[in-house]
Structures are given as structure tokens and as C-alpha cells.
């Protein structure tokens, strides 16, 4: 875009030309515009930072931020499930800061490293209590190791005490194993003795039955079938026949006769019926009327 803008501008000739014996100097009217363009071009320049082997060759450690004395770079080994977002949440920093410290262009550059540097605040929880993180050492610092050689007598006494402790420990383990084996053998022998002396109980008798007949004998089944198929239908027919006729056989039919005599009534097609006469008692009015008639 910058190149196109420069080409789109019209060419302006020099206003003043100064000649010298060795060169020609051209003076333009809009000199300030050229200086502005030059400053813009300088601002668009990109600063390249060394990465990987170039950073190791240079051997110069650049701090995370200029004048940021409260920031410390901590180095830790990467795991398979680590990511930039996880590291940023874990150490309380930004993803951009981690990428800037480790010279990452893309997030996939994380998987090319075995260890990563994380910017954290100095005198914080991570720098004081976290044992997994190690502070990044500057190349100029030197590590000094002090080794104290113990005395021969102390070393001999210490080794003898350790050896005696180990022997006691292994002896205790052997005794525990022997006790466990002996107890297991004793339990096995006692179980065998108890089972040999104990008489076997007879098996309970099983009642022969099938699932279909529920243990009913064959003659019981025959009796039930005769009862249901023959006897019950006969009683059913007799009962309804008697209810339909409305009369019982050999029943007596009695009738009242005024003279108090007894008569037998016969009806064709039916049995003879006996009629019993009931004597009638005359009332008092009828007797009074009879006496008055006799007096007249």
C-alpha cells in the first residue's frame, strides 16, 4: 500500500538548483512532507528477535519488560496436555506474554520445546511455595557446590546402624510369614478333622410330583372330572325343571265343604286330591232371625 501511494503522487520538479564544483543540490518546496514519509517508513520497520539456536549462540538474556523488576521468569518442563491457555491460567499471566518470552509466532511452537518459561510476579506464591518451578538462571551466574566429607568413624557407625536396622526389619518380615503359614496349616488341619468326625446328614425325601398336576393322584383327577361333568349338570337340570313347573309331585289339594264332609276330587291327568270340609258356625244375627220366625 505504501508503494502504491508513493506511485500515485505527481512528480514535482525542484524549485532551486544549486551547483557546486563537485555536485548539484536540488531544493524542493515541500521538504517537510518528505521527512514525514521517512518517519512513517521508519515506524513500519519490524524488529526481528533471535529464536532457538540464534538465541543460544548470542548468550544474551533479554528481560521480559524493560524496567520490570517485579517480574521473574520461571522455567518448567512441558507435559503432553499442556497448552498456552492452561499455562496462562495456572501462572496468572497473559498468553501474549508467554509467547513473547519464548519467541513464539504461533501456538503450535509450544510443542517443539521440552521446557517453557513463564513470567510471574516476584515474591509471589508461585516463586515461594511451588517446588516444581525453577528460577531461570542468567548465563553469567555460576553454581557453586559444597560437598562435606564425613569422618571415617562416623561413616562406619552410620553404615553399621543402617545394616542392623535392615537386618531387624527383614527378620521381622520372616517371622510374620512363618506365623501366617503356621496359622493357615492349623486351620486347614482343624477343618479336616471336624469334617471327618461329623456324620453326614441324610438327604430330605423328595415328594414325587409334576408341575402340571400339582401332586394330585390320578383317581382324584378322575373323581373331580366325573363330579364336574356328570353330577353337577344333573342337579342343575333337576333344579330348573322344578322351578319351571311350580308344583311338587304328590301334593294334596284341600277344599272347604259347608256340611263339614270330606270329599276326594279327581282331575283327569293328575293324582286324586282329598278335600276336607270345615264346619261353619252360625252367627248371632242368623240365630235371632230364626227364633223370630219360629215365634210367628
UniProtKB/Swiss-Prot annotation:
Known glycosylation sites: 30
Membrane topology: Single-pass membrane protein
Extracellular-facing ranges: 1-217
InterPro entries for this protein: LYSM1-4, LysM_dom, LysM_dom_sf
Domain of life: Eukaryota
Stretches of the chain found on the membrane's Cytoplasmic side: 239-296
PROSITE patterns from the UniProt entry: LYSM (PS51782)
Annotated protein name in UniProt: LysM and putative peptidoglycan-binding domain-containing protein 4
Amino acid at each position: 500500500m505504501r508503494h502504491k501511494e508513493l506511485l500515485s503522487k505527481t512528480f514535482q520538479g525542484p524549485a532551486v538548483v544549486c551547483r557546486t564544483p563537485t555536485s548539484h543540490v536540488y531544493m524542493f518546496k515541500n521538504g517537510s512532507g518528505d521527512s514525514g514519509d521517512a518517519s512513517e517508513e521508519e515506524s513500519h520497520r519490524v524488529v526481528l528477535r533471535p529464536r532457538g539456536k540464534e538465541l543460544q549462540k548470542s548468550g544474551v538474556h533479554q528481560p521480559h519488560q524493560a524496567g520490570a523488576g517485579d517480574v521473574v521468569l520461571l522455567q518448567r518442563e512441558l507435559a503432553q496436555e499442556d497448552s498456552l491457555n492452561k499455562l496462562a491460567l495456572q501462572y496468572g499471566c497473559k498468553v501474549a506474554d508467554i509467547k513473547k518470552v519464548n519467541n513464539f509466532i504461533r501456538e503450535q511452537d509450544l510443542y517443539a520445546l521440552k521446557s517453557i518459561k513463564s513470567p510471574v510476579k516476584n515474591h509471589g506464591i508461585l516463586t515461594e511455595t511451588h517446588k516444581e518451578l525453577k528460577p531461570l538462571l542468567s548465563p553469567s551466574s555460576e553454581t557453586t557446590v559444597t560437598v562435606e566429607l564425613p569422618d571415617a568413624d562416623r561413616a562406619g557407625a552410620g553404615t553399621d546402624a543402617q545394616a542392623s536396622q535392615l537386618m531387624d526389619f527383614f527378620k521381622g518380615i520372616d517371622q510374620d510369614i512363618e506365623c501366617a503359614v503356621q496359622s493357615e496349616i492349623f486351620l486347614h488341619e482343624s477343618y479336616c478333622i471336624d469334617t471327618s468326625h461329623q456324620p453326614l446328614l441324610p438327604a430330605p425325601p423328595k415328594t414325587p410330583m409334576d408341575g402340571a398336576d400339582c401332586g394330585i393322584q390320578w383317581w382324584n383327577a378322575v373323581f373331580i372330572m366325573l363330579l364336574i361333568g356328570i353330577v353337577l349338570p344333573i342337579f342343575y337340570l333337576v333344579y330348573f325343571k322344578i322351578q319351571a313347573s311350580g308344583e311338587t309331585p304328590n301334593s294334596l289339594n284341600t277344599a272347604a265343604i259347608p256340611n263339614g264332609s270330606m270329599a276326594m276330587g279327581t282331575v283327569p291327568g293328575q293324582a286324586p286330591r282329598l278335600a276336607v270340609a270345615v264346619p261353619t258356625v252360625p252367627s248371632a244375627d242368623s240365630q235371632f232371625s230364626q227364633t223370630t220366625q219360629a215365634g210367628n
